[in-house]
Amino acid sequence: DHLMRYIQDSMRWIHTSWNDQIELEGFPDEGFAVITEMEVERILEIIRPWKALFLASPENFCLTIQEDSDICYREVPVTRREVIEEMEGWIGICDLALKQHSQLVYQGL
């Protein structure tokens, strides 16, 4: 997912776990991670400002993302609408998890 890769540095502030045993910083590229209710709140604290920033973007722009662990970067053309819709989806899932006092399970990119 291009947007997740673009904001990946700030998403490393989220603490997740794998199999309730291995603590992770951020989200894995492969496999699953469990996100506690407290960390869901932190996700919202990170995503909402990103959404506000993208609301000020041009209608069409590029996200510059790193290709896997290589030094290579590439530009991915996106629209403001698709970025905002994706972020609103993330916010909706997080809001629902908080309302239900649930954890989230994340499947890698």
Label each PLM-derived region with a short phrase.
Residues 1-103, 107-109:
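Acidic (Asp/Glu-rich) sequence patches and key acidic residues
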